[in-house]
């Protein structure tokens, strides 16, 4: 399922850890709605930086989140957070791209 032109649901939910352990990391309908909104925000960041964005961590099921040692209040759990990387840019540069 394509959420936006450049971000798919599969990309926003993929986890090497979940795959390696055979864990289901499928979000529910509410989380999919949140991921869609998040993907739209990431499209705006992509336009500002002028480069593709790699999502290293998006939605996390409770099992995955617990295995990673994250808190239950993590926004990843509800599809409202993503860890991203942009080739050739550090986090500060990405953050300043909107200025």
Set out the residue ranges of the language-model regions:
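Cell-envelope/glycan interface and biosynthesis
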Residues: 3-98
């Amino acid at each position: 399922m394509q959420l936006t032109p450049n971000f798919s649901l599969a990309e926003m939910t993929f986890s090497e850890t979940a795959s390696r352990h055979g864990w289901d990391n499928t979000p529910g309908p509410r989380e999919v709605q949140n991921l869609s909104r998040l993907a739209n925000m990431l499209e705006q960041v992509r336009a500002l930086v002028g480069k593709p964005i790699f999502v290293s961590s998006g939605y996390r099921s409770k099992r995955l989140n617990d295995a990673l040692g994250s808190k239950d209040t993590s926004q990843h759990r509800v599809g409202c957070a993503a860890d991203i990387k942009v080739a050739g840019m550090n986090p500060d540069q990405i953050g300043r791209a909107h200025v």
